[in-house]
Amino acid sequence: MGFNVIRLLRGSAVAVVLAPTVLLTMLSSAERGCPKGCRCEGKMVYCESQKLQEIPSSISAGCLGLSLRYNSLQKLKYNQFKGLNQLTWLYLDHNHISNIDENAFNGIRRLKELILSSNRISYFLNNTFRPVTNLRNLDLSYNQLHSLGSEQFRGLRKLLSLHLRSNSLRTIPVRIFQDCRNLELLDLGYNRIRSLARNVFAGMIRLKELHLEHNQFSKLNLALFPRLVSLQNLYMQWNKISVIGQTMSWTWSSLQRLDLSGNEIEAFSGPSVFQCVPNLQRLNLDSNKLTFIGQEILDSWISLNDISLAGNIWECSRNICSLVNWLKSFKGLRENTILCASPKELQGVNVIDAVKNYSICGKSTTTERFDLARALPKPTFKPKLPRPKHESKPPLPPTVGASEPSPETDVDTEHISFHKIIAGSVALFLSVLVILLVMYVSWKRYPASMKQLQQRSLMRRHRKKKRQSLKQMTPGTQEFYVDYKPTNTETSEMLLNGTGPCTYSKSGSRECEIPLSMNVSTFLAYDQPTISYCGVHHELLSHKTFETNAQEDTMESHLETELDLSTITSAGRIGDHKPQLA
């Protein structure tokens, strides 16, 4: 009994001694779990955007996820992650890493996701990824890789996705992916690859998606992919492919999408190019150099439900008819921007509308271009040129080699004339606009000058109207003569009193009476016949410039003086004739 009590006391003493030690260990572990400046969420540690140049050493050993992205790490040392044997994902993207030790990833066998994108890595040693055989996702994109080792991915049998996008790779070693039997996605886009060896993809029996876009391929041979029996999506857009062919004798039944947009494809090597892909559902051929597609190629597109053909140089002739008929019967998704690139008359017109409106497929090829030219709208304005006069010649007999003028030439001429008319109209409009602008600026800057110009313009208009009214009152210049047939009473009255009525007439005009004041001396001195009429001499002065109203009054007084002189002369001569009559 006493022995048991002593034993119990000893056990209690040991527990009391060990309790502080365990507590200190727990506290130190808690302090080590979340480094300074980092954010910890359970067993996930986020040390992002801290400008770190070294990986913190105080990370908990039980950490499951570590993010060190957007820092300034430059290299990964030997056993860099030793002690983090529970780590399952590691993000090291967007750093300055350029050197990775061959044993940097030792001790993290449970790692499933490794992100090393957007760094400065130019090469990897062959054994770099040997310690992380459980990787599912490996991202090496946006680096400076020039080449890959032949055993670069040796042992990565569980890898599902591999990203090598946006590097500087030129070649891919043969059988480099042989151990990646479970790989489903391979991204080799945005590199400088020109060609691929036949056995590059050997062993990749589960690959479903392959990216080869934005490389430098010039040919596409579907026989290069004989072992990709599970491939569903193949992306080869924006290369330099001009020829597509296939030399394989088996059917590629798994392929469902093929993207060949943005290449230089002009034609297909044979009618059986697409016969090896009977389950193809989506085909992208936009932005190439296709002018037409043959009927045999169209017949092989039996399974398509989505097609893209925009951005090609379609020639809207009879060769386009098979494609238009196929598009009309196609029930899947397609773009409506399939436009004609030639001939010039149809540039920018939808191919279906062109065939419908211009009857391209309804008539023979010999009259096709002629009918097309006649069907096109002609410009409304057509300049009429004067016809040169030629001497009449007998018609020449028709020759064998003579041909009628081409209607296409007439259409071109009318097209050019229409453009000239438009250009002239635009030039005239711009000229008027410039004149109005100058007038507006002058009016704003020199308002007094503009007022003076307006006043002068009004005065000129007033004078012009006055002269026109005088011209209307005054008939044209005619020959005037004095016709005087006095009676006996009038003659005696004029001789006795010195005054009498005098009548002159103007041919085709009117008559007026002029009172005369006989002055014999004036009559004797005036030896030329003077013809006076009612205001006619105003026309003789109409060419003179009347500056002011005072000048106009002066001219009117002169006219009255001349009228008096003419009247006296006529009266004197009438008196001279009287004795003769007597």
Swiss-Prot record:
Residues 312-363 form the LRRCT domain. Residues 378-411 are annotated as: Disordered. Glycans are attached at residues 126, 357. Residues 31-420 are extracellular. May play a role in the development and maintenance of the nervous system. Exhibits a limited synaptogenic activity in vitro, restricted to excitatory presynaptic differentiation. The gene is Lrrtm3. LRR repeats lie at residues 61-83, 84-107, 109-131, 132-155, 156-179, 181-203, 205-227, 229-251, 252-276, 277-300. It is a single-pass type I membrane protein. Residues 442-582 are cytoplasmic. Belongs to the LRRTM family. This is Leucine-rich repeat transmembrane neuronal protein 3. Gene3D superfamilies: Ribonuclease Inhibitor. It is found in: Cell membrane; Postsynaptic cell membrane. GO terms for cellular component: extracellular matrix; extracellular space; glutamatergic synapse; postsynaptic density membrane. It comes from Rattus norvegicus (Rat). SMART domains: LRR_SD22 (SM00365), LRR_TYP (SM00369), LRRNT (SM00013). Residues 33-58 form the LRRNT domain. Keywords: Cell membrane, Glycoprotein, Leucine-rich repeat, Membrane, Postsynaptic cell membrane, Repeat, Signal, Synapse, Transmembrane, Transmembrane helix. The chain crosses the membrane at residues 421-441. One of its GO terms (biological process) is positive regulation of synapse assembly. InterPro entries: Leu-rich_rpt, Leu-rich_rpt_typical-subtyp, LRR_dom_sf, LRRNT, SLRP. Residues 1-30 form the signal peptide.
